[in-house]
Amino acid sequence: MSQENVEVLGVAPILPSRNLTATAAFYVRLGFKEQGLWPDEYLIVMRGEVGLHFFHSALLDPWSSDAGCYLYVDDADALFAEWRPLGLPSEGIPRLHGSPNDTDYGLREFALVDPDGNLLRIGSFIAEPG
């Protein structure tokens, strides 16, 4: 099989976590399913076909973390409405940052910062791309 025929099926960020068990619990609250947990080693959570991977980082400082990823969803407003009642603060760590707004680059997005300082920007296309 030539390289041109190999289909890339997905991508998963690998983010730091001080406590993988606590990270799993946080993401399960957000509607992810725990796919695999190896305490003090590795965690995989899934929501639909999207996976987030985490590695143990005991010395991580959430306030200085620069890790993050972008999650494309079909409806940013609906996901924000699902997460808002969870009572996440709008400041500090963790936080549900802002409410969905339209960007100049064609996405409607908001952000979440998890307990380890990982930034997740979540967005949906305002109009079909292309």
Language model region names:
Residues 1-22, 69, 124-130:
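N-terminal beta-strand motif that seeds the catalytic metal site of vicinal oxygen chelate
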Residues 6-9, 61-66, 104:
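Short glycine-enriched loop/turn motifs at secondary-structure junctions
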Residues 7, 15-52:
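Core segments of cupin and vicinal oxygen chelate
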Residues 10, 16, 53, 111, ...:
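Conserved beta-strand segments that form the floor/walls of ligand-binding pockets within enzyme
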Residues 10-12, 49-51, 68, 95:
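Structural motif
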Residues 19, 69-119:
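Vicinal oxygen chelate
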Residues 35-67, 119-124:
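Conserved short beta-strand elements that form part of the metal-binding/catalytic scaffold
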Residues 57-58, 97, 101-102, 124-129:
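Acetyl-CoA-dependent GNAT
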